Amino acid sequence: MAQEKRGSRDDRQNREERDSEFVDKLVAINRVAKVVKGGRRFGFAALVVVGDQKGRVGFGHGKAREVPEAIRKATESAKRDLIFVPLRDGRTLHHDVHGRHGAGKVLLRSAKAGTGIIAGGPMRAVFETLGMHDVVAKSTGSSNPYNMVRATFDALKHQVHPKDVAAQRGLKYATLQARRAASGNGSEE
């Protein structure tokens, strides 16, 4: 049986198809300097958020002497560290959640259909690439894009699907949904 060579044309086409499902957004680009004996060497640092708009999202950081190379490195880094976030009705969060990183703190709240993405700066890029359509987000503390993105990811990692909550509590999913509807936190459609 003949083995295909690594890096063959078919492999490249499959990689391009896999990569085409992702949407990437450039969040921040900074000029950075490395001090060497002869002076300063300037380069660029990029922060990129990547997602499939179906619940998977990741962020990456890349540095290089040229902007396009920094963006490429950041995009590759983001694709390696994707997380899955369960969405209610494919559009919003299941419950309100807090996240923090360093001095950056965020509060993410689920929203009614038609609300849109009410979020500032770097958080908006995360929600758009995630595929979330309705969310209200508030950031406090540090407005550094790196801290805001990491705090947003911290909050999203704490998002739990109601089926998992029901399993932990030893309840049936339908019972949990009935309680949610009775308390007024059910689907608002």
UniProtKB/Swiss-Prot annotation:
How is this protein named in the record? Small ribosomal subunit protein uS5
Q: What does this protein do?
A: With S4 and S12 plays an important role in translational accuracy.
Report the GO molecular function annotations. Answer: rRNA binding; structural constituent of ribosome
Q: Which InterPro entries match?
A: Ribosomal_Su5_D2-typ_SF (IPR020568), Ribosomal_uS5 (IPR000851), Ribosomal_uS5_bac-type (IPR005712), Ribosomal_uS5_C (IPR005324), Ribosomal_uS5_N (IPR013810), Ribosomal_uS5_N_CS (IPR018192), Ribsml_uS5_D2-typ_fold_subgr (IPR014721)
Q: Which GO terms describe its biological process?
A: translation
Domain topic, free-text comment: The N-terminal domain interacts with the head of the 30S subunit; the C-terminal domain interacts with the body and contacts protein S4. The interaction surface between S4 and S5 is involved in control of translational fidelity.
**What gene is this protein a product of?**
rpsE
Residues of the S5 DRBM domain: 22-85
Which SUPFAM superfamilies does the record match to this protein?
A: dsRNA-binding domain-like (SSF54768), Ribosomal protein S5 domain 2-like (SSF54211)
Family listed: Belongs to the universal ribosomal protein uS5 family.
| Cross-referenced NCBIfam families | rpsE_bact
Q: Which organism is it from?
A: Allorhizobium ampelinum (strain ATCC BAA-846 / DSM 112012 / S4) (Agrobacterium vitis (strain S4))
